[in-house]
């Protein structure tokens, strides 16, 4: 159709659209509704981090118009004698692009920048958003030396110095969280432990562009950990954890007996309840990292548990 409106997109979008629209559509819709508070009454909605509110109801039908023109790295087009450059800049998604209009010195960056710390993981469920790819993309946008920065969410920023400040703070914040997470990963810390360690330095924590309106640094630490080395924390206790129901039953028995954690750990070990012994030993070590009794219990319980998991 000659009158069809052209829709430009980076080629990775096809896989991403099909994945969300088909493979994981039911759970993504459910978790997205929770993330954005869609079921909440209007008076309970404060904001949604990067906007006021998202309104969807049962009477509305969601649709999708697919792109008509795909590109890989970059594409230059002309519309009404206006030059427009499209470039692939992976960040919040791996199909992200910017729209650069040289004549206007304006760059539209999609969701690779907004007035909130970069959403390195969305709790509705997203695949790994590579922090260093995002940083590299922001550095490429900085090289444009734009006069106007136009995000998809939140207000535009004008003035080259203001744009540079915003983009620099943004990339520095992302890289700091990434680098510190990697540092502690290589020290052997678990995600729970790393979350307690990674805090932004004062000059970044006070930046107006890095406030935690849309997500939290703790979830970004966990996402980075998982993105680099997967779900396993490195603690043998996490290989075959008790179910919530099993743990609840054991805690109830423990409360009825009014035993100390250390005594209960010894009982579990002697009864061959090695997983429970591991988890109790972890509690003791969390209270006192020098607890030799707990370390010995964990070492003894770890041996039989290790035989149940083939590497």
For each feature predicted by the language model, list its residue ranges.
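Hard-cation-handling environments
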Residues: 182-261, 266-283
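Conserved small/polar residues in nucleotide/adenosyl-binding loops
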Residues: 308-311
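Active-site HxH/HxHxD metal-binding segment of metal-dependent hydrolases
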Residues: 1-67, 72, 76
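Metallo-beta-lactamase
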Residues: 65, 74-78, 83-187
């Amino acid at each position: 159709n000659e009158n069809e409106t052209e829709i430009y997109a980076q080629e990775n979008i096809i896989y991403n659209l099909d994945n969300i629209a088909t493979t994981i559509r039911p759970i993504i819709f459910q978790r997205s509704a929770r993330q954005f508070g869609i079921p909440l009454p209007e008076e309970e909605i404060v904001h949604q981090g990067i906007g006021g509110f998202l309104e969807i109801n049962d009477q509305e039908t969601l649709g999708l118009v697919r792109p008509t023109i795909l590109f890989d790295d970059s594409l230059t087009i002309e519309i009404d004698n206006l030059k427009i450059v499209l470039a692939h800049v992976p960040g919040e998604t791996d199909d992200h692009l910017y729209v650069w209009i040289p004549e206007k010195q304006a760059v539209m960056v999609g969701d690779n920048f907004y007035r909130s710390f970069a959403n390195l993981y969305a709790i509705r469920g997203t695949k790994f958003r590579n922090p260093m790819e995002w940083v590299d993309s922001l550095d490429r946008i900085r090289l444009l030396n734009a006069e106007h920065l136009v995000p998809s969410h939140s207000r535009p920023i004008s003035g080259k110095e203001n744009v540079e400040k915003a983009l620099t703070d943004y990339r520095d914040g992302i890289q700091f969280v990434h680098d510190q997470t990697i540092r502690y990963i290589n020290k052997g810390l678990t995600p729970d432990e790393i979350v307690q360690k990674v805090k932004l330095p004062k000059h970044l924590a006070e930046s107006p562009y890095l406030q935690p309106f849309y997500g939290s640094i703790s979830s970004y630490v966990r996402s980075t950990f998982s993105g680099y080395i997967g779900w396993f924390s490195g603690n043998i206790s996490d290989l075959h954890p008790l179910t919530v129901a099993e743990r609840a039953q054991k805690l109830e028995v423990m409360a009825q007996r009014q035993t100390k954690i250390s005594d209960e750990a010894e009982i579990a070990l002697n009864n061959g309840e090695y997983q429970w012994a591991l988890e109790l030993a972890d509690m003791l070590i969390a209270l006192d990292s020098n607890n030799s009794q707990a370390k010995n219990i964990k070492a003894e319980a770890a041996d039989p548990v290790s035989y149940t998991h083939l590497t």
